């Protein structure tokens, strides 16, 4: 939409677009804090470039292809592999779009895949940029969007972990500057005057001083404690949800673990059933970087395709004795992730459906290759053959802790600790391990410490660390209560502080015994309640060894001492203690665990189908809200097309005394929407004459003459309306330009 000459100087336009960009950017900044939306930089660049194209008055045949190409390139980078010039991915993406459109038509909002949701988000941002352009440049108003932004940020600050302290300051500064400058522009437009730069400067300087002084005073002034610091419990109570504390989420697997802590609700939603002869933990992925608040994977790493379902041995040295086992997994049809759940030591994976698999070299997550990921909701039925390790304690005790990480055969990412980690955590790690001369006993000392009476397993009264608190430090020294995330994170951090390489693993426990089964083993059911996290420690010349620090849980790994017959592949040689623990597990269901389930990402490096767990209702609501917002924007932008049709249907058949007056008023509003407003100095007759002269017609003057007869002479308005109805209909339906 080109700018008219009276729309302002190029410098003022650039300033308005820049401020509008900053205001819209504030909507994007919190997304990665309270949702699983990642890579928001793509969205920020998109709105910035769209504003620039609008500023440079690019025509639609430049703007539209540019935005479409940028969107497609972004989606390819985020969701597809291979060269962007290999157009086969475009065909796959278009198939996904068609599939998701059918899902929308059938009301299956939860099943939309991330790449399609990302496309919708780009479209929504595009519409918002156009709407801001219209508001700021043509309407010279920003108050509504400013208030919406303030409301949005304050709601997030109240009900989510997002801290909006500085965001509110930025928004107030930007919003007040825009309000003041746009008010000046409206005065110039209404009075049809051109102000010299000195006059604009005289307006701008006091405005800047006033806004900055008010903001500074607000920051410096003493503030009393909030009278109502947390409204969430009250809102929960009046909605009969008071048993769920603020920040509580449902148990279940979640994609991201950047911010751990807080209570959770139980959720017995089935995830999968499995059949096998030995209980085991089912891995999903590992994380290597502790941030002080949770876990991330700093390097997404390369994924390699599994040839014929064969998995490279990433876990054990050839010296470690193993027992070959097989588990048959049946994933619940409603489970919304397409990754595999598999035991450590997986050797071959045989999916029932025709699908190629790949494993990420860093996270060790196994999922369909990216070309097939969008088509597969979950893995359905598959069989895993794996090697269950039997570790010899005397061999493990021969391993000494290396003096520095360079002596290990891998990068130091399994030794990483944040610089902000409190020193007392390192001191505790040294204190727990200094009396032992080998790695295994040091690890057991930490595991036993976390299993002592000093710590309590708790799922409800669990706090979230404040901004200046470390997650592990708070658990070890302040609360000393929590669930698997607390125990496993604490153990990894303590081990790394003691110079022992370790990593954080998440997945599921073996679940609950369901039925006897057949020769292939017993059948177990795993639900969201069995989501869990544990620890794996790297022993040189042995491999990764599983440890279980969480109270009430049993380590599935097998250990045998030197006086026990070598295990080999004979399951009967497993240690008696391990067998007793397995029997105890059958009698006593494992305590319910959790991985905090957060909202589905708009984008993720490896897409999976949408899930239907705790966040599904929120995603559906957001999808409906997005569609309604897009519809509202479209209705507003194109209101000059549909309002006349509505007005004609409403007024055409009326013959009462008020119909003519309402119809003429509707026509004036339509002309104003088309950029032909009546000037304050004009009479109706002068205005009608101007319209007729501009478009070489006489209809407006004829209609106005009849209107004045009804208005000023009090003639029968009903009869005049009947005579003038056709003129009015022609005028209001006319495509003014």
UniProtKB/Swiss-Prot annotation:
Keywords: Cell membrane, Membrane, Transmembrane, Transmembrane helix. The chain crosses the membrane at residues 11-31, 36-56, 60-80, 118-138, 142-162, 164-184, 200-220, 618-638. It is found in: Cell membrane. InterPro entries: Bact_TGase-like, Papain-like_cys_pep_sf, TgpA-like_C, TgpA_N, Transglutaminase-like. It is a multi-pass membrane protein. GO terms for cellular component: plasma membrane. Residues 581-603 have a biased composition (Basic and acidic residues). It holds the Pfam family DUF4129. Residues 556-611 are annotated as: Disordered. The keyword Cell membrane applies. It comes from the Bacteria. Its main location: membrane. PANTHER family: PROTEIN-GLUTAMINE GAMMA-GLUTAMYLTRANSFERASE. This is Uncharacterized protein YebA. The lineage of its organism: Bacteria, Bacillati, Bacillota, Bacilli, Bacillales. The gene is yebA.
């Amino acid at each position: 939409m080109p700018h008219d000459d009276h729309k302002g100087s190029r410098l003022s336009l650039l300033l308005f677009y820049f401020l509008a960009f900053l205001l819209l950017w504030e909507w994007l900044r919190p997304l990665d804090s309270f949702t699983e939306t990642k890579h928001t930089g793509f969205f920020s660049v998109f709105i910035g470039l769209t504003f620039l194209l609008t500023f440079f008055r690019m025509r639609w045949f430049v703007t539209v292809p540019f935005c479409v190409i940028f969107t497609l390139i972004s989606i390819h980078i985020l969701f597809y592999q291979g060269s962007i010039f290999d157009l086969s991915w475009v065909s796959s993406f278009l198939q996904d779009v068609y599939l998701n459109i059918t899902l929308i038509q059938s009301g299956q909002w939860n099943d939309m895949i991330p790449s399609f949701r990302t496309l919708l988000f780009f479209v929504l941002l595009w519409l918002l940029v156009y709407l801001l352009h219209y508001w700021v440049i043509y309407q010279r108003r920003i108050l509504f969007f400013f208030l919406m932004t303030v409301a949005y940020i304050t709601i997030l600050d109240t009900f989510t972990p997002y801290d909006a302290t500085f965001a509110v300051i930025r928004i107030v500064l930007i919003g007040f500057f825009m309000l003041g400058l746009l008010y000046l522009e409206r005065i110039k437009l209404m009075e049809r005057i051109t102000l010299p730069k000195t006059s604009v400067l005289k307006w701008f300087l006091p405005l800047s001083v006033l806004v900055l002084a008010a903001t500074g005073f607000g920051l410096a002034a003493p503030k009393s404690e909030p009278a109502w610091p947390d409204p969430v419990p009250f809102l929960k109570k009046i909605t009969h949800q008071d048993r769920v504390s603020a920040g509580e989420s449902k148990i279940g697997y979640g994609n991201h673990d950047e911010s751990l802590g807080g209570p959770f609700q139980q959720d017995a939603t089935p995830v999968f059933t499995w059949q096998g002869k030995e209980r085991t933990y089912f891995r999903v992925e590992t994380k290597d970087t502790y941030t002080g608040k949770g876990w991330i994977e700093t390097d997404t790493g390369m994924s390699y395709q599994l040839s014929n379902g064969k998995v490279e041995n990433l876990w054990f040295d050839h010296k470690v004795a193993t027992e070959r086992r097989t588990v048959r997994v049946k994933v619940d049809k409603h489970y919304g992730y397409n990754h595999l759940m598999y035991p450590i030591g997986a050797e071959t994976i045989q999916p029932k459906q025709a699908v190629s698999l790949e494993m990420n070299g860093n996270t060790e997550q196994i999922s369909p290759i990216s070309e097939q990921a969008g088509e597969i909701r979950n893995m359905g039925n598959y069989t895993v053959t794996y090697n269950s390790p039997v570790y010899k304690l005397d061999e493990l005790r021969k391993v000494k802790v290396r003096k520095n990480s360079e002596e290990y055969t891998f990068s130091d990412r399994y030794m990483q600790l944040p610089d902000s980690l409190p020193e007392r955590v390192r001191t505790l790690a040294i204190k727990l391990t200094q009396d032992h001369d080998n790695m295994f006993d040091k690890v057991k000392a930490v595991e036993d410490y976390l299993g002592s009476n000093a710590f309590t397993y708790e799922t409800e009264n669990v706090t979230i660390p404040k901004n200046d608190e470390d997650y592990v430090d708070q658990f070890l020294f302040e609360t000393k209560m929590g669930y698997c995330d607390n125990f496993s994170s604490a153990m990894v951090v303590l081990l790394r502080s003691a110079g022992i390489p370790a990593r954080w693993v998440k997945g599921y426990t073996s679940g609950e015994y369901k039925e006897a089964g057949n020769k292939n083993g017993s059948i177990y059911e795993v639900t969201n309640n069995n989501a869990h996290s544990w620890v794996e420690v790297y022993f040189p010349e042995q491999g990764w060894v599983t440890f279980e620090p969480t109270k009430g849980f049993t380590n599935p790994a097998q250990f045998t001492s030197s006086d026990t017959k070598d295990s080999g592949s004979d399951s009967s040689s497993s240690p008696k203690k391990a067998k007793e623990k397995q029997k105890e597990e059958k009698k006593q269901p494992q305590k319910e665990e959790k991985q905090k389930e957060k909202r589905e990402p708009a984008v993720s490096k490896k897409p999976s189908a949408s899930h239907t767990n705790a966040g599904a209702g929120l995603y559906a609501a957001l999808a409906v809200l997005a569609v309604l917002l897009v519809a509202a924007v479209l209705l507003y932008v194109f209101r000059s097309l549909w309002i006349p049709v509505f007005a004609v249907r409403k007024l055409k058949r009326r013959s009462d005394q008020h119909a003519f007056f309402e119809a003429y008023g509707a026509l004036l509003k339509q002309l104003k929407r088309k950029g032909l407003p009546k000037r304050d100095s004009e009479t109706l007759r002068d205005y009608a004459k101007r319209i007729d002269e501009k478009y070489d017609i006489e209809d407006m003057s004829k209609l106005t003459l009849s209107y004045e007869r009804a208005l000023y002479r009090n003639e029968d308005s009903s009869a005049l309306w009947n005579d003038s109805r056709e003129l009015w209909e022609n005028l209001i339906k006319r495509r003014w330009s």
